[in-house]
Structure formats: structure tokens, C-alpha cells
């Protein structure tokens, strides 16, 4: 994540907002500050692995990433290990599954957990054959309790069973229920359990790192990705949604961003300050598009954001276009005044944001994104821009 680029954008916005009337300044900053914190306070998720030592976690995380990943097998010490993909973000892992197989000790694990609070536990099992998870559940319970006592936080636990694609759906469901029964059988694990998910992680990567589509047998990986991202604290969600390609979570975060910026633009657009607001609208819309790009997993670049505006048929002064559209409406419908200006600013801003979500997150073509923009309609249930 390019924090400096994001910080520079928000500093520019804050400088422009400082020129607004006092009451409006406060209202705008109240809406923007939570969004600013989501992006500027982002950090890597901290995930603790529990469960079956024989489960292939490299295959599981490779399936989540869509990229071949060889995870470090802890042999001597329990340490947090950071994994990153260039331009995509990263995550941190503490593999606590091998207490009975390696020289890992409780004191070493305790040190790692005391040092940094886990965000999420993944209890992983794998293979077509049934296995005894009694010891894994006992060890997992102790680690979960240790983290809860040290950090006074109840962290979620997701059960994951990785099975061959050749298994029937009924067999898969039976194995998932078996894992869930093991987890519910432990009071401590049961109290933290979010859900159990059955997946198939098998996918072949070519020598160049690309996916062999004819050998892509992944199942339910998208469900697991979104479950992981949603259970993380807010400050770790964007990075996780990016790197694990959790589309539903990406859309939810982006929608929150678009609605907040639209609300602010509606408030700014309604002010009787001729053309003084257009740099603020422009900066807000530009920040919104770069934010959607960031959420989607694209490498953040101001040039790419400007090119997106251009592809929609807008120049960087898009805010001015929306405001001028409002002025034209005022001439035709006397008496409505500035409320139309705010509504048009809101509709235009929402159209830009919705188009950016469709293009960067949903993967539609630029032609389709342009059609969405040209509709310039707010959601029916929305009161955005009604001030």
C-alpha cells in the first residue's frame, strides 16, 4: 500500500475543506475521518494456524492468492512470518500446529502471541481420510485461551477442511460436519467458532506463475476469502480483501467509501459559493476513485486514476461539470435553487464511484462502466444529496 500517496491526497482534500464555512467543515470532516482511518491505518492481518500438521497450508494460501506460494515450515522457533506480493499487500502467519512434531515450545508460542495479538485463528484439516483431531483441538484451545487472556479480545476462529475435487458433495458435507463437531466439542474453540468451510485448494501453476485453467479445481475458495476478510478488524480488512481477492468484502468497503464521499459532495454542492467548491468536489472524486483502486488490489497510481476519468469522458475537473449541470437545471426550474446543485453533485459523484467499482472490482469492460456512469442515478433507497 502506498501510504504516502494516499496521505498526500487526503492532505490536499483537508487543505481545500479548510476554505469552507466552519459548520460545513465540521460536517464534512466528520464524514471523511472514518474513511481516512480505514485507509491510512491499514496493516497486515495476523493469522494463527491451528489444526492438522499434515494439512498443506502452502496449497491453501496459494489457492487464496491465485499465486504459487511456498510457506516457511517452522522448525526451531515460533515466529510471525510475513508474506507479501508486490503491489498486492500481504499478511502475517504464526504456524502453531506442530508442537508435537518439532522443537516448538509453549513458551516460544506464548512469546509470539504476547508480542502481537492475533486477528484470526484458522483451524485447518485436510485429506480424504478421517483423522483424529483431539490433540490439535486441545492445543488449539490452550492457544486461543492464552491470546484471549493476554489481549482481552475474543478473536474469531474459522474451521477449514481441504478436500479433493473428486469427492462427492455429500462426502464433502459429511467431512465438514465432522470438523465442525470436533470444534464444537471443545468449549473454548466452540465459543470462538465463526463457521466451518469445506474447500478444494488444488490448482496447477505454470512455470511462469500463471494458472493452468484446465487444472484449476478450486472450490469455495472465494467463500473462505470473504469469511477471512470479514472477520478481521477494520484496520486489517482492506489489505486482506486485496491480497485474498475477497470480492464481496471489497464491494462492501468500496460502497461505504462511495456513499460517504457522495454524501460529502452533496453537502458541498449545495453551498452558495460560486465555483469555489469545484476543486473540492474534484479532489473528493479523485480520492474516491484511487480508494476503489486500492481496495480492488490494483497498484495505486494517480496516473491510472486520471486515465479512468478520461475513459469516462471526463477531465480532472469533473466536479465542475456536475456543478454546471445543476446551474442549468436551476434556470429551467426557478425556486429550486441550490438543492438541485447538491443533488446533481451527489448523482455525478455516485456515478463515478459506482463505475469505478464495476470496472476495478467487478471486472466489467470500460464500455459497460461508461454506461453506468451515464445513467447518473442514486440508489432508490438513498437520501444522498437531499440536504
Residue ranges and their predicted role:
Residues 96-104:
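Short acidic, Gly/Ser-rich segments with clustered Asp/Glu that frequently serve as metal-coordination loops
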Residues 1-97, 290, 299, 354, ...:
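Conserved G1/Walker A P-loop phosphate-binding module
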Residues 85-88, 107-194:
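Conserved C-terminal guanine-recognition region of P-loop GTPase G domains, centered on the G4
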Residues 16, 67, 146, 182, ...:
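Conserved, well-folded catalytic cores of nucleic-acid-processing
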Residues 18-38, 46-49, 204-267:
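C-terminal-of-GTPase-core extension/linker across diverse P-loop GTPases
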Residues 257-295, 299-350:
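Membrane-inserting effector segments that mediate pore formation, membrane fusion
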Residues 353-387:
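Hydrophobic alpha-helical transmembrane segments of membrane transport and translocation systems
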Residues 155-156, 164-238:
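Canonical P-loop GTPase G-domain recognition
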Amino acid at each position: 500500500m502506498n501510504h504516502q500517496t494516499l496521505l498526500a491526497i487526503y492532505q490536499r482534500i483537508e487543505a481545500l475543506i479548510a476554505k469552507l464555512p466552519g459548520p460545513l467543515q465540521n460536517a464534512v470532516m466528520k464524514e471523511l475521518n472514518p474513511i481516512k482511518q480505514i485507509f491510512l491505518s491499514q496493516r497486515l492481518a495476523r493469522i494463527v494456524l491451528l489444526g492438522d500438521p499434515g494439512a498443506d497450508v502452502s496449497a491453501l494460501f496459494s489457492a487464496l492468492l491465485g499465486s504459487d506460494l511456498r510457506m516457511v515450515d517452522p522448525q526451531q522457533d515460533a515466529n510471525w512470518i510475513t508474506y507479501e506480493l508486490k503491489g498486492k499487500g500481504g499478511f502475517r502467519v504464526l504456524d502453531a500446529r506442530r508442537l508435537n512434531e518439532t522443537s516448538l515450545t509453549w513458551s516460544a508460542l506464548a512469546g509470539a502471541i504476547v508480542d502481537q495479538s492475533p486477528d484470526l485463528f484458522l483451524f485447518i484439516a485436510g485429506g480424504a481420510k478421517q483423522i483424529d483431531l483431539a490433540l490439535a483441538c486441545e492445543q488449539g484451545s490452550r492457544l486461543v485461551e492464552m491470546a484471549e487472556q493476554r489481549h482481552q479480545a475474543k478473536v474469531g476462529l474459522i474451521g477449514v477442511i481441504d478436500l479433493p475435487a473428486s469427492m462427492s458433495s455429500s462426502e464433502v458435507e459429511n467431512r465438514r460436519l465432522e470438523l465442525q463437531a470436533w470444534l464444537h466439542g471443545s468449549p473454548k474453540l466452540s465459543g470462538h467458532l465463526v463457521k466451518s468451510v469445506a474447500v478444494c485448494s488444488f490448482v496447477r501453476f505454470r512455470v511462469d506463475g500463471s494458472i493452468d485453467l484446465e487444472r484449476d479445481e478450486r472450490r469455495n475458495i472465494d467463500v473462505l476469502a470473504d469469511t477471512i476478510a470479514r472477520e478481521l478488524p477494520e484496520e486489517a480488512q482492506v489489505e486482506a480483501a486485496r491480497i485474498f481477492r475477497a470480492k464481496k468484502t471489497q464491494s462492501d468497503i468500496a460502497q461505504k467509501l462511495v456513499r460517504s464521499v457522495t454524501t460529502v459532495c452533496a453537502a458541498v454542492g449545495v453551498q452558495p459559493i460560486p465555483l469555489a467548491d469545484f476543486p473540492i468536489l474534484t479532489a473528493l472524486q479523485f480520492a474516491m476513485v484511487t480508494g476503489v483502486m486500492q481496495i480492488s488490489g490494483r497498484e495505486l497510481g494517480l496516473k491510472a486514476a486520471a486515465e479512468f476519468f478520461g475513459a469516462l469522458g471526463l477531465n480532472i475537473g469533473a466536479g465542475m461539470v456536475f456543478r454546471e449541470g445543476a446551474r442549468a437545471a436551476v434556470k429551467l426550474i426557478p425556486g429550486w435553487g441550490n438543492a438541485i446543485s447538491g443533488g446533481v453533485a451527489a448523482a455525478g459523484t455516485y456515478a463515478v464511484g459506482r463505475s469505478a467499482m464495476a470496472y476495478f472490482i467487478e471486472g466489467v469492460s470500460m464500455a459497460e462502466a461508461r454506461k453506468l456512469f451515464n445513467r447518473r442515478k442514486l440508489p432508490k433507497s438513498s437520501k444522498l444529496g437531499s440536504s
